[in-house]
């Protein structure tokens, strides 16, 4: 058997193996949901959003939108083992900075944590919204003046979006402090970014509000302009989070 033939056979087997892995390995990127009842029989909705490197989970009353819990940080998937570095946790700040590894199983429409017996259904896979990913607030305009901030500092305001869901979180990894969060659904149509708020940790009266903003991408930055849920003018700059 010639060396050329052997090399060709090895090459074909390698390509076939890579195609097999691609077909049967699933990505968690997108949004997932789970409904369950707490000890009082209250229905709780849990939403997880994965960007390419970051994730967040939020739990809230499925009917009233009352905020209950959130945590999040970075993630990596090796086989069926997911490793997370915790950046915020509303129930236990001492978990901030911890690295946690656990088993997950992912199919096209289900994500399960066997050890916890948690089972999530897929909402989307990162589409169709234009802004899927993790973003950090990097600046804003006040009285026409552009004011920038260092996104490498421990105090961050992050917004993580799938193709249809969003969650913003303000936190400080150095002080292990959680500042606030909110989230819901969003759309991006003809330069308009629209949010429907489903939970808001600081003020539950914001639940159910719909907000519309102008948006565009300039040199990789998300320019976000409109009014806050309080009705105040807003003109923010968000940069895509890399680290």
Which residues are covered by each model-predicted region?
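Lipid interaction determinants
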Residues: 24-76, 81-181, 192-243
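Beta-propeller blade signature
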Residues: 183-187
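Bacterial Sec-dependent N-terminal signal peptides
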Residues: 1-31
């Amino acid at each position: 058997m010639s060396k050329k033939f052997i090399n060709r056979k090895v090459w074909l087997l390698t390509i076939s193996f890579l195609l097999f892995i691609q077909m049967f390995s699933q990505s968690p990127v997108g949004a997932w949901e789970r409904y369950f009842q707490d000890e009082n029989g209250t229905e709780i909705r849990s939403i997880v959003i994965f960007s390419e490197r970051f994730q967040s989970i939020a739990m809230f009353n499925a009917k009233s939108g009352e905020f209950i819990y959130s945590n999040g940080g970075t993630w990596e998937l090796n086989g069926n083992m997911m490793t997370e570095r915790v950046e915020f946790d509303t129930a236990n700040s001492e978990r901030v900075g911890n690295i946690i590894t656990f088993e997950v199983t992912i199919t096209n429409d289900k994500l399960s944590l066997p050890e916890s017996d948690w089972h999530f259904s897929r909402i989307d896979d990162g589409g169709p919204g234009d802004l899927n990913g993790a973003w950090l607030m990097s600046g804003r305009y006040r009285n026409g003046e552009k004011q920038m901030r260092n996104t490498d500092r421990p105090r961050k305001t992050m917004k993580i979006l799938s193709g249809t869901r969003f969650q913003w979180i303000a936190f400080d990894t150095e002080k292990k402090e959680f500042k606030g969060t909110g989230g819901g659904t969003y759309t991006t149509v003809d330069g308009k970014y629209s949010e429907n708020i489903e939970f808001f940790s600081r003020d539950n009266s914001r639940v159910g509000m719909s907000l519309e903003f102008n948006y565009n991408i300039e040199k990789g930055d998300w320019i976000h302009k409109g009014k806050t849920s309080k009705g105040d003018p807003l003109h923010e700059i968000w940069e895509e989070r890399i680290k």
